[in-house]
Design a protein with these regions (language model features):
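Amphipathic alpha-helical polymerization modules
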Residues: 1-139, 186-289
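Cysteine-poor, low-complexity segments in flexible/peripheral regions
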Residues: 141-197
Length: 289
């Protein structure tokens, strides 16, 4: 049986072949140029919607990173101040030991009092110190900040947690730590009067200094624990971020090797179709169309 094709059918077939090859070549060229596998959600609804979810996850990851950096900086500032305050508390405790020497006279006690007062003034300044942005290092209140999924930590060190109750950032002289040190200063002043009378016994003064020292060091340790949590969260979120980026790339980004091969194939077909159509145009078969 002989199959016959009309001239119009041959012409339309040639035109359609060129259009198909051109469309495919342009599509692959767009993917190579943009680096994106899909231009519209309709190209692959699942992949694009999954990509949107990945974008959301990456945005959350960026939020976690910002929170981690903020918390790490806040606690680093607090720890620097508390390290110094702990050293000053140790100096006060050494002064207390010196004050128990039986060889001291009233002038010696007055000299120790001056040293203790100077330390207290320096500590008060550190209690109310501000960071580089002008915010108090030890705030009257702190927030809970999420550093990774389902993990919340204190944004910083609370003023009363470090220095005891009774005072605020505006009234540091009312905190337990300040009052305990002030009692030591008063004790030294009274010893310098050589009356034999003191408002507080040495045991009471020592107990107050030790209580404030213990509270400060415990707060410093807790802050260090938060810093370790942040470090662990950074490590975990960094690995998760790499996984998200890889997944998104595999899902949405153009596979350049495959796309280049497909583009080359489509371009070859287009060139062949154009050449064939050119020969058909020159043929007598279409001279009367």
């Amino acid at each position: 049986m002989t199959v016959r094709f009309s001239s119009n059918q041959v012409l339309e077939s040639g035109v359609q072949g060129m259009e198909n090859a051109l469309s495919e070549a342009m599509s692959w060229n767009q993917k190579i140029t943009s680096g994106k596998q899909y231009d519209r959600a309709s190209d692959n609804a699942y992949a694009v919607s999954r990509g949107v979810r990945l974008d959301f996850d990456i945005s959350r990851l960026d939020m976690f990173k910002a929170n981690q950096n903020f918390v790490a900086s806040s606690h680093a500032n607090s720890q620097t101040q508390m390290d110094s305050l702990v050293n000053e508390m140790n100096s006060l405790k050494q002064l207390l030991v010196q004050s128990q020497s039986g060889a001291l006279n009233p002038s010696n006690f007055k000299a120790l009092k001056v040293q203790a007062e100077q330390i207290l003034i320096a500590m008060k300044q550190q209690m109310t110190a501000k960071d580089g942005t002008g915010n108090p290092i030890f705030g009257d209140a702190v927030n809970q900040v999420q550093i990774e999924p389902n993990v919340m930590v204190d944004s910083g060190v609370k003023f009363n947690d470090a220095f005891g109750t009774g005072g605020t950032l505006r009234t540091p002289e009312n905190t337990q730590m300040y009052l305990n040190i002030q009692k030591f200063v008063t004790y030294l002043n009274e010893k310098g009067q050589n009356t034999g009378l003191t408002t507080q016994t040495v045991d009471q003064v020592s107990a107050g200094l030790n209580a404030s020292f213990d509270q400060l060091t415990m707060t410093l340790q807790r802050s260090g624990g938060v810093a370790n949590q942040v470090d662990n969260a950074k490590t975990a979120m960094s690995a998760f971020g790499v996984q998200l980026a890889d997944t998104q790339s595999v899902l949405l980004d153009t596979d350049m090797a495959a796309a280049t091969a497909s583009y080359t194939r489509a371009q070859t077909l287009l060139n062949a179709a154009q050449a064939m159509f050119a020969r058909l145009q020159q043929s007598n078969l279409f001279s009367k169309l």
